Amino acid sequence: MTRDSGKPIVTVLTAPGDAEPPGLDALRAQAEVRFASDEATLNEALPGTRVMMVTDFRTEALAAAWPKADRLEWIHATSAGVDALMFPALTDGPVKVTNAQGIFDRTIAEYVVCTILMFSKDFPNSIRLQQNHQWKHRDTERAQGKRVLIVGAGSIGRQIARLTAAIGLKPHGIARAAREHDPDFEAVHGNDSLTEQLELADFVVVAAPLTAQTEGMFDRAAF
């Protein structure tokens, strides 16, 4: 592997078996681009690397190969969540970590709306009946007026609130602190109200980041 090109080194960490991310041609003109997909290949690629792009949001390879990161300055995750990157050697050091905040808000919100409608309109049984050539009329539920509890009132949760409200649902949020008069939620309740709010919800959406504070919040009492 060339190590004296004079260009800054960028290492791309993908999940094993994933294809090379598109759109890297322009980057290659300005940097030496290396690829890794597991601990072994990352151990080889990391020395001299100044920038990393991580597309595998479940990776454990970086924590294992961290001693090889002798020049690393910046890690960019192409996902919204970065919990796999939050190991002590990284969080306690000077390396900057960024993510793709905002990129997936609309996509995830559309998926949530689709799933709510799927359950309300009983799509699985409709598909099963069609596959069996059974043309059976059934009554389904209306989503309008139902209460959806969105745990996590950040950018993703806020977009979910907007889209669910657009089809007539009543979005309520859970956040670290309660607040009144939110433009996108019927109300935003504090974390200490989770169990109470779960009892009132028709649908529950978890859009909170996985952190030390949120891990385990859906415990036995919540379920």
Task: Report the location of each language-model feature.
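N-terminal glycine-/charge-rich "phosphate-binding" loop or analogous flexible N-terminal tail
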Residues: 1-61, 168
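Active-site regions of enzymes building and remodeling cell-envelope glycoconjugates
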Residues: 29-34, 50-51, 94-97, 184-192
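Short acidic active-site motifs
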Residues: 40-41, 61-64, 85-86, 192-196, ...
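Alpha-helix C-terminal capping/helix-to-coil transition sites in glycosyltransferase folds
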Residues: 47-48, 71, 199-200
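Phosphate/diphosphate ligand-binding glycine-rich loop within oxidoreductases
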Residues: 50-127
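Glycine-rich NAD(P)-binding loop of Rossmann-like domains
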Residues: 126-159, 187-188
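NAD(P)-binding Rossmann-fold cofactor-contacting core
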Residues: 166-183
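Rossmann-like adenosine-cofactor binding region
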Residues: 178-223
